[in-house]
Amino acid sequence: MDAYEATKVVFSRIQALDPDHAAKIMGLLLIQDHGDKEMIRLAFGPEALLHSVMAQARKELALLPPPPPPSSSSPTVPAAHSPFLLSRQNSGRGPAPSPSPLSASSPSSWAQAQPFSRSNGSVDEVVGAGEELISPANSGGGAAANAPPFFPRGGDVLLDDFQLQEQLAFLNEGGVNPSHPLQGFDGAECRSPGPGEGGGMFPYGLGWANGGPGHRRSASVNELCLGGGSSDGFGWKPCLYYARGFCKNGSSCRFVHGDDAAALTGAAMDAATAEQQQCQDFLLRSKSQRLGPAAFPYSPTGSLPGSPSAATKCLSLLLQQQHNDNQRAAAAAALMLGGSDEAHKFMGRPRLDRVDFASMMNPGSRQIYLTFPADSTFREEDVSNYFSIYGPVHDVRIPYQQKRMFGFVTFVYPETVKLILAKGNPHFICDARVLVKPYKEKGKVPDKYRKHQGDFSGCTTPTGLDGRDPFDLHQLGARMLQHSNSTNEMMLRRKLEEQQQAAELQQAIELHSRRLMDLQLLDLKNRAAAAVTTAMAMTIPTANAFGSSQPLATTMVESPPDSGEQLKGTGYFTEERKMVNGGGDKEESAGEASLNADSDQSLEHNLPDSPFASPTKSSVSAHQSFTTTDTGVVATSSCSASHVGISAGTNAGGGINHLRPSTLDIPSPRDFFSVSSRLASDHGAIGM
């Protein structure tokens, strides 16, 4: 319960007691502003506390008290039957009757209902304390000097000390040091009654110097107003440890043991009210734990930060109880409707399994990943309203950018995620097609996927991490997308990485282009060699298919048809070959040069005696060596020079000297080429 609801409860209670002056009294209480804790305590406190506050407010506003009700003269109710008194099971003290705190007591009535004590002393220990209880019938005299901490006047010292005590209550087990009591207060005057002594108005006090064990908690709702008396022998709440099988406190436990239905009659609250009390108690404790270190920064315990795990555990337990209550309610409804299948489905799991509890602590199991078009116009509220059909939605996160195409939805229970994924795709939100995918934490991707990614994506960052890895988006995106500064930093980082990648890609392209240029240069050299090989493979004379006596290919000399020029052509062949060998093969070894010279000499020595004689076997081998070694040189020189050319086709006309064979038997092309290249006589044309 928050302060707003507590204020409404207090106003309704004041209006029930004094409807004429309720608005003025409530206005004064709001103007004084004693804090949310005091308002909540007043909302759940006994009527004696409320009467005291109203009496003090009427005194300050100079208002007349309302006429007493007819039942005010009734006898006092024993403490054992008062519904507003505290009770604890197995407290070790028997019940002791005491007057009701609503009675108009004498100045010694403070002894029967001591509000300020922590030692839980008996009535005999506090008899004789002459303090006065403020009540509607006794609100004058010295009441302002002994005002409760809710009042601003006459109780400033009390108020400061009480606030100090509330801040220290959770930092020390046994209270403060007994050697430093509060000045102005006796230990005997600051005792609160035990469980059966009738005091329950102010559950906190100043009895630190009494040596008794101090309460470590402030006035929680479950200790103020909803418990049976100590004579009943039980409290209002069952023991959870005993229900699970074993309670370490044994008979001294403050909660109920056993399955007796009569022992649970003191539980006057339903489950919703109990959860509100637990939440309120948790909030009060956390607030006091925050105030304690702030009030005493130099204390040994004040500098210790609060444990965040305790708050997480409390909230998780509250969620677990709420889920269990919802399942019980659903099972009860299914039983009432007569559906056994539905009842079995809900009753099969009365509590959360350990796996489900772990999944509750892990937000990844309660999230889904959404993808949708960039031109979608729906908002986070629309997404939350749509998916609330399947279950309660905890959070919706859609990145704030111009072209949004993904988002995340977090649910309260992981079962909702399973239900949505089982339904399949697509989903339509505001006429936009939305696809749902399971949420995967990129930090837990198997190694094989990382290896594949490392093979196909180059590492570009100096730290060795791939900037294109979506680890940043999913692992840190939940927090980074919520803050614009972090989003800008992430965008700048990605831009820098993209520029780095572009620069490295450009360098790779330039390096590849250089390699291609080198390959092209090598290709030009290879083309020259290929041209030589092609010239070698050309067949100069080819036989006529029909046995014609005229060859299809002849060798011609374009110089004038005199014998001197033809002889000069032979010398040109040798000079050209020498020039090619000398200019193109400068790095040729001496052995290769001598080999070429020997081949030429052997060729000259193997010339036949008569030009009309057929070549010998030795000359044939020499001719073969000549053709294999020097044909490329001749072909290359013939391409560049204008003296010798090779023409194909039949030449029927005159004007060109033809080398005609003497008979119809056409020699082999190798022999013909060897003989035709050998011009040793002064004749114009030599016929075979």
From Swiss-Prot:
Organism: Oryza sativa subsp. japonica
Biased composition (Polar residues): 613-624
Gene3D superfamilies attached to this UniProt entry: 3.30.70.330, Zinc finger, CCCH-type
RRM domain boundaries: 366-442
Entries under SMART domains matching the protein: RRM, ZnF_C3H1
PANTHER family: RNA-BINDING (RRM/RBD/RNP MOTIFS) (PTHR24009), ZINC FINGER CCCH DOMAIN-CONTAINING PROTEIN 22 (PTHR24009:SF47)
Compositionally biased spans, kind Basic and acidic residues: 574-589
Region Disordered, residue ranges: 62-123, 552-624
Pfam families according to UniProt: PABC_AtC3H46 (PF23182), RRM_1 (PF00076), zf-CCCH (PF00642)
InterPro entries: AtC3H46-like_PABC-like, AtC3H46-like_RRM, Nucleotide-bd_a/b_plait_sf, RBD_domain_sf, RRM_dom, Znf_CCCH, Znf_CCCH_sf
Protein name per UniProt: Zinc finger CCCH domain-containing protein 22
Zinc finger (C3H1-type): 233-260
